[in-house]
Amino acid sequence: MNFKVVLAAAALLATQSFAIIGIGGHYAPGFGTKMKAGEIAPVADGIQFGHGGFDGTMQGFGIKLWIDLLPIFDIEATYNIQFGSYDAALYVDGVAEPLPLEIELAGTPFGKANPKFVASGLDVSITYPLTFIPVIRPYIGGGVTYHLNTFVLNQSFVQGIIDDPAISDMIKSAANKEGLDPEALQQKAQELETLGQTLKQKVQDKAMDEGLKTSIGGHALVGVRAKLPIIPIAAYCNFKYYFGGDYPKEVDAGNMTLEVGGGFAL
């Protein structure tokens, strides 16, 4: 009799520990991605351009929905967004200091700062639980990934922005600050602000024309999810390795992402 009670209690505990559906958010850094620096090269008469790169961890975050309705397999849908910052500057002939480019793109969660390469992806995964132990659920799986990547602020992109002679003249005028008195420097600061707004709009217009670079790939994953009985909160950790997908030529994708987070589970 006691043995039957133990079995019934264990079954109840397992049922309450595994949620049918859950939604959560997570920290999602990407590892191993590199962006090569671009050599300084002419983009207009008397103006050159160069950009830096990055090597290491791309910061990121994401959201996840999981469904445990199927008897053997579970389903996850995940959207991650990651970004890496790099330097970019214009070099005007006869001017000692470069003119840094600070880009503020509408529709991205970043303010005015160094340019950023932003990579995002929508994953649809099927996972297989390795055990059915109550409270904790390790699993393996894989699925399809829809990649969306932004442009890199490279030579050809900048060339398309400042091909207007009026823009080139604004850049040359705003960059030259040598030998100016305080009043003239204040005027230059106003010119730089106007130039920044003009370049911002130019970048946004060209970015809208180019759009996001999209492609299809896949991924494999290993992870674990934990949920206490009764309490409608779960924690999870996934490691994903991606394959396929197209990136700008300057970017060497590391293809590895860690997801650590939690959410509501019913």
Predicted feature residues:
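Cleavable N-terminal export/targeting peptides
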Residues: 1-20, 170-196
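Outer-membrane beta-barrel and related beta-rich outer-membrane complex signature
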Residues: 35-39, 87-95, 150-160, 201-210, ...
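Predominantly the C-terminal beta-signal and adjacent terminal strand-loop region
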Residues: 36, 86, 178, 195, ...
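Extracellular loop and loop/strand-boundary signature of outer-membrane beta-barrel proteins
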Residues: 45-52, 107-115, 204-210, 244-250
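Short glycine/proline- and aromatic-enriched beta-strand/turn motifs that initiate or cap beta-hairpins
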Residues: 18-70, 265
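Gram-negative (and chloroplast) outer-membrane scaffold detector with strong preference
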Residues: 29, 64-164, 229-231, 266
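Alpha-helix-centered segments that form part of catalytic cores
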Residues: 61, 195-220
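Residues that define the transmembrane beta-barrel architecture of outer-membrane proteins
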Residues: 45, 55-61, 116-122, 136, ...
